[in-house]
Structures are given as structure tokens and as C-alpha cells.
């Protein structure tokens, strides 16, 4: 059971850690959660008994500890072989005569949805050197077309069924598997039948023909090109170093330029026939459908599939090589200086027993304990900004313990020594019982919360959990069983066992150290070897004290507030309660999410409390303000207070308000309210979190973005707001002026300003919830309200440019980007039009995908988005952008002009419109049943009562859009004389000449925008 991530809320590993782990899966990620330990993969045998589905009766209720831990004498289905963990009785398992394995279950969360996963036991580790990237290439070809589906038609079919490509239908390829995923929002019998037919055809008979290969080659190459970055290059070098001599070291799923360029239809077909076989396939389905019907559909569409030739043996994934190079220095100017250690051990199969899992839980406690000590040390001022440890059975190739360190400044030797000393202390000296109890309760709480919310676990989560478990030869259990097993292992979590676990995890048959620096250092390799091998003394004073921090440690608030107004809102059972101090509560007790309570607090005026020309360093606030503490409690004390509970401290800045949001529980939400209220009443000002925020900026900042994608991410949003300082990307020069005194001067009055609005939705009792708010926010003094000046409530769009603004990046010359944007509007008066603009953007987005990606392969991720700020009267825009090769930039501009002209000249077809409306119809039907949807729509209603009406009309505004509406919006807004554009090229590359934009003679109907007079500009 992988439970460490669920409990490690306190520790946020730096992105450097991701570089240590094996090759990133390519395409959309498939979430993995709650797998249990590893087991040998059982070779399916087609026998009469195997053909019959194993269909245990669903449990009547939560299984008791005794019942769930009792071993069953009945034959176990394929998923639970080699295991004594209690089976999740909701699943029904079976094996077809051809060896295909399946698992199905009924689940009505969300209602009417069915989630399907088809997992193929083939990934990049099955490729020969000359086949690098073939597994991923075939994933693309399978989605493109197959025996039963014409080229590109599967996407359109699923759109008509309400499934949005990239969200509801997608695929991923990893080192060890390829998984095809479809979530049908409203699964009719016909839609289910069609979807299983398409998926079966995809994996058994894709169109691997020269024409399709040539078309999709450009798409795969574009995906590879867009993924190139200093981080990805460092990841490749890291894996090659760590896993030297093993396939994992040099088998990235994306492949190489040479192998992708040289891939032929015959070679790809041979790879498919070798590895795409029914006996290497798992079909997992969960959803609002009869399991018997689902099983029959699996049999109907997959039974006739037969593998070509004998089943090939799996390649040998190798073992860590102790003789390989132990230290390495990588020069990477565009990534942070970092030090990474890895302790490698051979990966072996283990029977998936309760005892094995409970032993692993001791490992999790040991790692979490070290991570807490590292986090506390970093917060208190050390030579490292962040450090973390993690255990991973990487791609069934190694069992490894990873250490990642991000030093402050260039003194990486000191940072390495300090981190090793903290680990050494854990290796030598057993932790106290209080240390273990502190970590135990964190994981226990996370698992208990999973039990409390298990009735609303989505079908997509369930199939992803099962497929993820198969991926690494594990099983999965229900949340209550997982909690039982965890609690049953508590007796093993003794100080001596935790210490012994630490010693085992920080020992390996091969140990390696990697240093990443920004420039050449002739002595770095020798210094790394010395620092890595030097004996280390255990750290002193890193163990945490046992002083209890409770809610009583917080400063007291005043007397509970009195209610001035209590009335129903007239919608959804929401109640509006106004206290005498001006605080307003919107309360909706409901069971939509059992075990969850959502809390949202709004106050002040957000970005509008600052001038668009004022550099207020808003980027520093989320990571600094809450970490500064409350009253006399610093960050470490608050961590103790929050430990093992559904409590959090998060701060956000909206256009018109500051926010504090949390997802709590029925047991903890009252204390969550008190935390937020006390933060407003007794803010603490601490230099340490601010210093860490500044240090993080200095560590990660690059003067020039390191890729085209980075340049777009950093600059486009800021430039489309006409260089509004409130959203400006941070620079070290900004941080130099950011002192604690200045930070306090800016934020102390803003925390005290403006009436407070509280939303409380979820699993609460009405009277208790009202009392809790009265005792917290109702107890605050009445707050004044400084209304922002009119100039702060303006959002600008840049003036039109005759030639695109040129942005530079410092990456590959092959990487470029392009952006075209048109001003639209803002505010609430034209809210219906704003929502229909989003549908126009969806249609443009689909046309970009169909042409630039599917047909031409010019771009992998073209996009179109409409942004309409409801709280500003101006500043909205519709933007299209993409990454591509520099020489294709003129083509992008020409094609966008053609799309815009066509949309303005003629209505879209009924089918094209329906393929965009139907996914939105299904999405809104699901969203409107959620607390999160209504909270997001009604936020700010105490100041603007129109929010309720707008929320009620949202669905109709979106779904009633007509082809004539789309044409009118294109004519009104997508005009050459108002548009702004930019191109991104590598530093030193000359942008290509662009064709002249089409002229529109009539400018009388051009939209009103607040635009600056700035002309073309050059920016990094």
C-alpha cells in the first residue's frame, strides 16, 4: 500500500526530485493510488473455470477488522493471487479464453458515468535500441485510427458522446505499460458498446500503414520537441547515471530523433504484433452500469482477438551495477544547483501479504520522520532550501531510496553534509515514541479520511487505482481494509524497528551521488567524491520537542457574535446569516461529499487593492504569509497543531478579494474556522519564511526562459494584461527590496480590511456550524472597508501591434512559439456573451487540433482560450497559442487567419457545434451537483447579489449557443485591427517574416477596450 504520499502533507519536495525518478510517462498521466505490495505476474491460463467471472457478493457494509484480515479459503481471482490481503468485494474479475484479464464493478459516482481503462503490458523497457519510442508511437497510431474506426474519427465519436479529448479520452505510455483511458460522462448502452468496440479495435488492429505513420510521425516529433527542456535533459542524464547498465537508464518513452525518424510501418507493425496481445491486456471498468452487461461487452469485443505467434518473454530489466561510476557532475545552467543521492538495491517480486505491507509501513514512518526533521531544519535556517527523502520501486528495475537537496547559494558541500548528518542521526539512534506517534497519526488520519469519503470515490479513481496496481505487480484494497492493515501494523512501529528500517533503506548494493551546477567547476567531481564518502557525525538538536501544541495555544478571540439577519437564499438550501459585525455566512449542510467540509473565506479587495503600476511582489505572498504563523506560534508550532488533522492554511489572491480555503472534516472544521479567524486577528510577522521565499526565487530564476514553453508561461499572461505589475513575473531585483518591514507595511492593513464572507458547505450540522462561525468570525471586531480607487479596478489589454512582439528563450533553436490575441471585454453586464465566447474558443481550439496536430503535425498542443474577468469591466481576451518549429510560424498565422475568416463568413455546422456543446452539457451536469461548483460561482455574493442569478443562468448561457451566435462573436471580436501577437524564438534566431493580416474595412463595431499606447516591444 502506497500511503506515504497521502500523509506527507507537511513536506513539499522540490521539482528536482522528479528528475531522480525513472522516465516520465508520455501523454496524459494516469493517477495511481492505494496499491498494495508487489506480486509475481500470473500468466493467464484459458480454462473453462477461468472463463467464468469471479463474482463475489458485495459486502453488506464496512468489513470489520477481524473479517477483513481473515484469510479466505476460496480460490482467488487473478488480481489477488499470491496475496492474503482481503479482497475488495465490489470488483468482479475474470479471464477470457484468449488470456485477456478483466475487472468490472458498479459505481454511481458520478451518476451515469462509466470509466474504462485498457492497459497493455508494454512500455519503453520492452523496446530494442533501434525501437526507442515505438511503444509511444503505437499509442498515437492506435488513437488515430484502427480497423473499425476511420482516421481521426474516435475523437469525434467520443465528443458526440460527451467525452472531451485530452480530459475524458486519452492515453499514456510509461516504461512498463501503455494505458488507454475513456470516461463516458453519460454512458448509454449504445455508447458503451461503441466505446468498447473502438478500444478493442485500437489495441488489436490499429492502422499501422505508411500514410498514418508519416502523418503521426510529425505529431510525435512535435511532442518530443515541446518536451525538450533543461529539466528533461537533466532527467535523461540523471537516469543514465543512476541506472547505468540497466534498460531503465536509456529508455525514455518518447524515444530519440533517430529512431522516430527511421520508424517504418513494417517495423512498428512488428513491434505491435510482438507485444500487443490479449494475454498482456487488462480491461478495467467501473461505473453506473450492470457489471454483467460490462462483462458481456468485454467478451463481445475482445474474445476474438488472438495474439500473433508465441508470447515473448519479458526482457531482463537488470540489476544495479556496483562497479559503475559512483559520482557525477552535470553542468546545467538553467536548472537549480542540486545534490542528489540514491541508494540502489535489486528489485524483486514479493508475495503481497499483510505482513509484507506492514513492514513497508514501518519504512514509511521512518522516511516521514526524516522528512519532517529536514523540513524543520530548512525552515529554521540552514544551508539548504529544501531537502527530502523518498523510496520507490522504480519501473520494476530497482528498489531505491532517493535523497534530493537544493542548497541556498553555491555551498552545496555544506548542504550535503547537513542533510547527511540528519539522516545519520536517524540511522544511529532510535526515535522516541513521541516521534513515531507524531508520524503515525498523520498517515492514520489520511487513511481514515479516505474511509470517510469512500462512498464518493469516483469511477475514474477506482479504475486508475486498479491499473496502477497491475502496473507494478500489486493489488488494491478498499479504504477500510487499508486502514485496518495499517492499524494492525502499529505494534511493529517500535523505535528499534524504525531505526533498523532507516539503516536498511539507506544501504544499497550501489550508491551514487550527482551534483548539478550552473557552470564548469574543475574541482567539483573530486570535491563531490570527498564530501560523499567522508564519514559524517549525526546531527545534534534536530530532534523535535515533545511540547504539545493545541488549539488552546492560539490567542483567544472575543465573545461569540450575534446574528443580525438569518434568511434562506432561495436556492439549493443555502442559508444566508449576517452577524452584527458585518461577517456574512453562506451555509449549506449537505451529504454530497460525506466526510468533507469545504470552507472558503473572502475578505478585502484582492488585486484591486493594488495599482496596476505598483510592484507589490504579490508572487511572494502565498508562500510567506501563512508560514509566518499566528500569534506566538511559528511555522513549526503550527505544523504540530495541524499534524494528523484535516486542517490547512492556504492564502490566495483573486481579482476582487483575498481568500483562505480548506477542505476539512466534520471533526475538524470548527478548528479550521478558528485558525482562519485567528490568522486575521493575530497575524505574525516572521523574517524566516520571507527569506526562504526570496531564496527560492534566486535559486530557480533564469534571466532568459530556458524553453519556448517556459517563455510562453512566464510572459504571455503578463503581456496580455499590458504589463500589469500585479501579475508580473518575479525577478531577483524585486526580491532585493522586499524586507519584512515592507511586507508587514503592505499586508497588515489588508488583513484587517473589509467585511468577511464565509462559505461553509458539506457534512455539517446546521446549528453547530452557525455556533462555530459565531464563535470565530462572528467574534471579530467590525472591520472597515477601504474601497479601491477606480484606477485599480481597470485591467488593460495591450495596443494592437503591426508586427508580433518578439520573445526569446535560451533553449533549442528548433523550439518556437506563437501567440495571437484579441481584446473582448469584462464585467457582468455581458456575462452571457462571455460564456458564448468560451464556446467560440472551444471551436477554434478543436480546429487547431484537427489541422495543426492531426493533419499537419506542426504542433502538439495548440490551444485557444477565452478569458473574461467578471470583476473588471475591461481586460478580457481570446488567445490562441502554440509551440512549433520557427519555420512554421508563418503557417500558424496564416491558418489562424483562415479559421477566423471562415468563422466570421459562415456559420459552423450542426455537428461541429454539437461536438463542443455536448461535452460541456455533460460537464455542467456533473459540476452542478458538486459543492465546489456552487461555492466558486457564488463567491463574493455578499458584495454582489447578482452572483446567484449568474450561477443559475450559466448552463443555459453555454448550452443555448447557436451557430449564428458563434458567427456574430467572430465578426465582433476577432478583428485584425485590434489583435495583439507575439512570437517566441531562441536567442539569436531571427523570426521569419509574416504575411499581412487580412484587413477589415468596418471598424465601427470594434469592442471598447482599455488599451495602453505601447507599441511593439522586445522582451525575454
Residue ranges of each PLM-predicted region?
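Conserved, carboxylate-rich catalytic/transport cores that coordinate ions
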Residues: 272, 650, 747
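M16 family metallopeptidases and their MPP-like homologs
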Residues: 103-105, 110-137, 152-201, 232-258, ...
Amino acid at each position: 500500500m502506497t500511503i506515504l504520499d497521502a500523509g506527507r502533507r507537511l513536506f513539499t519536495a522540490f521539482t528536482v526530485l522528479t528528475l531522480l525518478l525513472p522516465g516520465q510517462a508520455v501523454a496524459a498521466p494516469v493517477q495511481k493510488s492505494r496499491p498494495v505490495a508487489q506480486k509475481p505476474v500470473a500468466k493467464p491460463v484459458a480454462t473453462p473455470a477461468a472463463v467464468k467471472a469471479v463474482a463475489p457478493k458485495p459486502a453488506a457494509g464496512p468489513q470489520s477488522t477481524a473479517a477483513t484480515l481473515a484469510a479466505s479459503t476460496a480460490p482467488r481471482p487473478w488480481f489477488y493471487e499470491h496475496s492474503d490481503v482481503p479482497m475488495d468485494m465490489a470488483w468482479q474479475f475474470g479471464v477470457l479464453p484468449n488470456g485477456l484479464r478483466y475487472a468490472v464493478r458498479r459505481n454511481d459516482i458520478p451518476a451515469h458515468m462509466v470509466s474504462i481503462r485498457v492497459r497493455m503490458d508494454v512500455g519503453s523497457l520492452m523496446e530494442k535500441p533501434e525501437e526507442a519510442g515505438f511503444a509511444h508511437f503505437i499509442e498515437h497510431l492506435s488513437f488515430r485510427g484502427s480497423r473499425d474506426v476511420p482516421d481521426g474519427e474516435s475523437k469525434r465519436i467520443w465528443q458526440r458522446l460527451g467525452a472531451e479529448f485530452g480530459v475524458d479520452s486519452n492515453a499514456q505510455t510509461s516504461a512498463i505499460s501503455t494505458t488507454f483511458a475513456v470516461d463516458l460522462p453519460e454512458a448509454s448502452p449504445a455508447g458503451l458498446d461503441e466505446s468498447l468496440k473502438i478500444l478493442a479495435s485500437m489495441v488489436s488492429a490499429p492502422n499501422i500503414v505508411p500514410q498514418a505513420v508519416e502523418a503521426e510521425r510529425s505529431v510525435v516529433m512535435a511532442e518530443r520537441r515541446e518536451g525538450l527542456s533543461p529539466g528533461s535533459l537533466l532527467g535523461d542524464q540523471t537516469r543514465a547515471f543512476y541506472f547505468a547498465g540497466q534498460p531503465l537508464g536509456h529508455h525514455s518513452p518518447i524515444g530519440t530523433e533517430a529512431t522516430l525518424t527511421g520508424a517504418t510501418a513494417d517495423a512498428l507493425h512488428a513491434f505491435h504484433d510482438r507485444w500487443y496481445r490479449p494475454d498482456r491486456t487488462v480491461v478495467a471498468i467501473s461505473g453506473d452500469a450492470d457489471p454483467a452487461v460490462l462483462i458481456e461487452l468485454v467478451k463481445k469485443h475482445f474474445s476474438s482477438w488472438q495474439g500473433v505467434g508465441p508470447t515473448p518473454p519479458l526482457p531482463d530489466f537488470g540489476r544495479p551495477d556496483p562497479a559503475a561510476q559512483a559520482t557525477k557532475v552535470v553542468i546545467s545552467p538553467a536548472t537549480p544547483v542540486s545534490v542528489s543521492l540514491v541508494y540502489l538495491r535489486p528489485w524483486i517480486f514479493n508475495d503481497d501479504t499483510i505482513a509484507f505491507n506492514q513492514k513497508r509501513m514501518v519504512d514509511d514512518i521512518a522516511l516521514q520522520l526524516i522528512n519532517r526533521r529536514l523540513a524543520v531544519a530548512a525552515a529554521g535556517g540552514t544551508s539548504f532550501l529544501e531537502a527530502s527523502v523518498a523510496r520507490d520501486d522504480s519501473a520494476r528495475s530497482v528498489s531505491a531510496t532517493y535523497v534530493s537537496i537544493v542548497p541556498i547559494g553555491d555551498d552545496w558541500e555544506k548542504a550535503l553534509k547537513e542533510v547527511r548528518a540528519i539522516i545519520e542521526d536517524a540511522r544511529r539512534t532510535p526515535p522516541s515514541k513521541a516521534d513515531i506517534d507524531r508520524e503515525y497519526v498523520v498517515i492514520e488520519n489520511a487513511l481514515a479520511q479516505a474511509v470517510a469519503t469512500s462512498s464518493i470515490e469516483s469511477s475514474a479513481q477506482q479504475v486508475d487505482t486498479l491499473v496502477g496496481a497491475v502496473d507494478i505487480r500489486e493489488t488494491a484494497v478498499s479504504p477500510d481494509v487499508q486502514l485496518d492493515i495499517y492499524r494492525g501494523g502499529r505494534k511493529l512501529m517500535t523505535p528499534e524497528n524504525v531505526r533498523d528500517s532507516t539503516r536498511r533503506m539507506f544501504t544499497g548494493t550501489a550508491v551514487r551521488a550527482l551534483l548539478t551546477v550552473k557552470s564548469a567547476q574543475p574541482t567539483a567531481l573530486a570535491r563531490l567524491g570527498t564530501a560523499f564518502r567522508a564519514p559524517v557525525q549525526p546531527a545534534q538538536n534536530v530532534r523535535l520537542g515533545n511540547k504539545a501544541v493545541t488549539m488552546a495555544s492560539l490567542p483567544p478571540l472575543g465573545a461569540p457574535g450575534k446574528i443580525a439577519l438569518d434568511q434562506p437564499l432561495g436556492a439549493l438550501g443555502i442559508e444566508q446569516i449576517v452577524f452584527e459585525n458585518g461577517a456574512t455566512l453562506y451555509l449549506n449542510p449537505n451529504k454530497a461529499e460525506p466526510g468533507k467540509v469545504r470552507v472558503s473565506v473572502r475578505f478585502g479587495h484582492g488585486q484591486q487593492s493594488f495599482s496596476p503600476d505598483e510592484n507589490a511582489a504579490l508572487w511572494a505572498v502565498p508562500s510567506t504569509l501563512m508560514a509566518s504563523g499566528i500569534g506566538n506560534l511559528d511555522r513549526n508550532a503550527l505544523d504540530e497543531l495541524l499534524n494528523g488533522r484535516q486542517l490547512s492554511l492556504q492564502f490566495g489572491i483573486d481579482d476582487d478579494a483575498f481568500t483562505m480555503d480548506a477542505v476539512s472534516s466534520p471533526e475538524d472544521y470548527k478548528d479550521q474556522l478558528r485558525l482562519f479567524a485567528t490568522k486575521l486577528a493575530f497575524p505574525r510577522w516572521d523574517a524566516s519564511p520571507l527569506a526562504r521565499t526570496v531564496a527560492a526565487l534566486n535559486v530557480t530564476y533564469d534571466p532568459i526562459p530556458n524553453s519556448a514553453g517556459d517563455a510562453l508561461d512566464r510572459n504571455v499572461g503578463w503581456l496580455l494584461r499590458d504589463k500589469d505589475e500585479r501579475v508580473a513575473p518575479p525577478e531577483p531585483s524585486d526580491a532585493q527590496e522586499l524586507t519584512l518591514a515592507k511586507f508587514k507595511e503592505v499586508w497588515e492593513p489588508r488583513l484587517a480590511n473589509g467585511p468577511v464572507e464565509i462559505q461553509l458547505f458539506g457534512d455539517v450540522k446546521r446549528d453547530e456550524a452557525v455556533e462555530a462561525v459565531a464563535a470565530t468570525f462572528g467574534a471579530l471586531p467590525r472591520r472597515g472597508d477601504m474601497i479601491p480607487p477606480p484606477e485599480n479596478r481597470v485591467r488593460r489589454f495591450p495596443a494592437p501591434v503591426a508586427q508580433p512582439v518578439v520573445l526569446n528563450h535560451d533553449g533549442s533553436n528548433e523550439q518556437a512559439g506563437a501567440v495571437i490575441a484579441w481584446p473582448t471585454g469584462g464585467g457582468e453586464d455581458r456575462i452571457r456573451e462571455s460564456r458564448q465566447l468560451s464556446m467560440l474558443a472551444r471551436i477554434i481550439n478543436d480546429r487547431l487540433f484537427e489541422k495543426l496536430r492531426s493533419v499537419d503535425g506542426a504542433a502538439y498542443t495548440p490551444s485557444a482560450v477565452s478569458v473574461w474577468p467578471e470583476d473588471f469591466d475591461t481586460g478580457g481576451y481570446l488567445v490562441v497559442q502554440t509551440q512549433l518549429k520557427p519555420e512554421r510560424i508563418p503557417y500558424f498565422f496564416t491558418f489562424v487567419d483562415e479559421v477566423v475568416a471562415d468563422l466570421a463568413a459562415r456559420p459552423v455546422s450542426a455537428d461541429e457545434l454539437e461536438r463542443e456543446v455536448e461535452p460541456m452539457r455533460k460537464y455542467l451536469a456533473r459540476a452542478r451537483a458538486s459543492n465546489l461548483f456552487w461555492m466558486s460561482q457564488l463567491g463574493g455574493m455578499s458584495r454582489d447579489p447578482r452572483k446567484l442569478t449568474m450561477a443559475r443562468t450559466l448552463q443555459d448561457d453555454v448550452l443555448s449557443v447557436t451557430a449564428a451566435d458563434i458567427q456574430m462573436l467572430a465578426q465582433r471580436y476577432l478583428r485584425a485591427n485590434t489583435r495583439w501577437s507575439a512570437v517566441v524564438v531562441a536567442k539569436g534566431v531571427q523570426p521569419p517574416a509574416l504575411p499581412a493580416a487580412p484587413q477589415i474595412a468596418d471598424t465601427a463595431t470594434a469592442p471598447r477596450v482599455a488599451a495602453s499606447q505601447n507599441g511593439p516591444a522586445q522582451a525575454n
